[in-house]
Each structure stands twice: as C-alpha cells, then as structure tokens.
Amino acid sequence: MERRLVKQEVKRLLGEYIGIRLRENEFDPKGRGQLTFLDDMVNQVTLAHYDLAISVASQWLDCSENLTWLQWEKVRAPLHVRPAYPNRKEREAMILSSYAGVLMNSIPIEEVLKIYGANSSASPDSTKVAQALLPRRSLHPFAMLTAPRAAECNRRQSVKLRRGATNKNTTSSSTKKATGQNGDPVGKGTHTPATNISPTPVLSSAQPFHSSTVMWRNLESAQRQMGLEGK
C-alpha cells in the first residue's frame, strides 16, 4: 500500500516537474520560436476546447436567448470543423482573458489595482501611478504566465528601465544647472509676480517603473498561490 502511494506521488511530482520544464522551454521573450509537429497536434486538440468555450460564453452573455440548448449531446463539436477563431491573436486573447479571471479571483483587489498602475482609493496614501509600457514578452501566453523565468525577465527589464530613468534625470538636472549658469533670465533676479495658482504636479519618471516592479512581484505571488512555480 505504501509503495503504491509513493509510486503515485513520485509520478505526480515528475509530471509537474516535466510540465514546468516544458513551459520554461516554451518561454520565448523575443517571439522567435518555431512551431513543431507536437505544437501543431496540441493546437488541433485545443481548438475544439476553444470553440466550445467561446460558444458557451457567447450564449451565456446573451441573456435574450434560451439556454436549454446547453446539453452535452448538443455542445459536442467534431474536430474537423473549422474553428470559429482561427486567428492566433484572437485565441491567445481568449486564453489571457481566462487566465486573468483566475488571477483576479485568487489575489486581493488591492493587488489587482496595483497591477493596473493605481492603488486602492480606500487607502489614505493612494497615489495614481502611470502604467509602464513594457514590451511584449512572448507569443505563448501560457508559457509566459506559468514559467518562473517570466518573472525574472520582467524584473531585469524593470531594473534596466529604472537605470535609464535615473540617467535621464541626472542629465536633465545637469542641463538645468548649465542653463542657469549661462545667463538664464530667471537666474538673474527677474521678479515673477506671485499667484495663487499652484504649480501643475509633475509625475516622476520613476513612477512608471514602480508599476513594472509591482507587476512582476504580483506575478510571482500569483504563481506561488496557484502552485505553478517550479520547486
């Protein structure tokens, strides 16, 4: 009995390890990967699941129609039927939408707001943070969202962007000092009448990169919560 349980546990652990390694190998930040014969076979099988999910979701969203047609005998679709969403981007958009729903149900709403670049309005020190424009990571959404290397890639990118912002701020401050020393009219003592209008707040250029740091941290925490991170 114990040997059988140990064998099942080892088999499960090997399956999880191999699955994580496959997802890591599929992680393609530059989108240069080529589809193999195995990928084509997997796509053939998953297209049926895509079509079934899309058809059920479309009927569920349309409240005007009767949902009595949702029976197993009627929703079964043959594999040779042309998919309703043959476009790769549309299929990946549906995958990302489904995965986003899973993440939003598994993490607090405050963390979700941080991912989208804004803190919760309920907190007193909430400040709006501009979103970071990060490049597209991969053409394989599942590989990106489940591979542990995706979070590390995001972290390195955020560090690189933060360094660029620091260098930009240093260059800007040195330019302002040089302008003031070379005869700026304001620096010579020109009087500016005081007004009650407060200056327009300027967002720090480092704020967008704080959003990117929060994104990869939340991605790592979501992976740990859902058991998708490699052991």
Swiss-Prot record:
It holds the Pfam family DUF5563. Signal peptide: none annotated. InterPro entries: C2orf80. Residues 153-206 are annotated as: Disordered. Residues 166-179 have a biased composition (Low complexity). Residues 192-206 have a biased composition (Polar residues). This is Uncharacterized protein C2orf80 homolog. It comes from Mus musculus (Mouse).
